[in-house]
Amino acid sequence: MTSHSSFTQRLRRALAPVLLAASLLPAGSAHAEGKLRIAEQYGVVYLLLNVAQDQHLIEKQGKARGVDIQVEWTRLSGGANVNDALLSGAIDVAGAGVAPLLTVWDRTHGRQNVKGVASLGSFPYLLVSNNPAVRTLADFTDKDRIALPAVTVSVQARILQLAVAKQWGDKEFNRLDRLTQALPHPDAAAAVIAGKTEITSHFASPPFQDQELALNRNAHVVLNSYDVLGGPSSATVLYATEKFRAENPRTYAAFVAALAEAAAFTRANPEAAADAYLRINKGGIDRALLVKTIKDPQVHFTVVPQNTFTLAQFLYRIGAIKHQPRSWRDYFFDDAATANGS
């Protein structure tokens, strides 16, 4: 045996473990598994993510599956911004309302195939006004401005359109759109509480709606999303591309397991969950009010999607999405954790 052939064999033996490890990685994502970039927004509707972050549940579930997960957290405002971040590759998992999920599912149908990963729970969204003259949708005038996270595409915007369509017919679904204005929840809540700006109403989410009702004596509820949707429904969901799910199976599974663990923790320990929220969000709300919000019997902490199809049918009916979903399963990934959804 020549020295050259001997060296070649030694080199092959030395490289064999490296080549084997590389062959086991998903194609095109040698560095992807174990990295997770999550975009959330504002409010208690993201509590499960706050608990998962505070308790390091994603990292814990990753270790149980043999992968060290590095989690990056980003906070954005509005479903449109979240969707742009997802499609640009800036994030791996998006957190937003059901309406932005349906928008991006429709937009990527047959391409990136974005679908829902899990729900973050069912919460009532309240349309709150500080204008004593506004008690119903019919009472809004051109002097009123309704703040919401994103005009047209946010879940609040779509629920408002659905409520308008129920009152005046589908052809009039955008009747109040001219009164809406995009504003992050914290800023909108501050405006409604102060009562000194053009923002007289806010289609909010907890805890901001609770703060408004508690801190401005003129603030009152004009509309409850549960009434519009026919019962409790998932307020906020998480979604990702088909590619990310396929190329990062252990990271994805760990993430879903961490969410389920966070939901169980929150149901069993609402006050500890409130403390986690306060730590992650650096305060910003009275603890007693926050605990009251978390314990609200209308609130359900679960990763299982609930009553999302009503909005999906409406968006197809008015032409907001081009692809008609036959059931909620069309726009959610098929996972055991969410199998009993709707």
PLM features per residue range, with description:
Residues 169, 175-177, 181, 186-279:
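Pocket-lining segment of extracytoplasmic ligand-binding domains
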Residues 34-173, 178-182, 200-206, 231-232:
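Short, glycine-/small- and polar/acidic-enriched structural segments
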Residues 246-322:
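Secondary-structure end/capping motifs
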Residues 59-68, 226-230, 296-305:
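Short, solvent-exposed loop/beta-turn-alpha elements that line the ligand-binding surface or hinge
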Residues 28-32:
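Sec/Tat signal peptide C-region and signal peptidase I cleavage site
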Residues 315-342:
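Conserved C-terminal helix/tail region of periplasmic/extracytoplasmic solute-binding proteins
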Residues 2-18:
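Bacterial N-terminal signal peptides that target proteins for export
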Residues 19-27:
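Hydrophobic core
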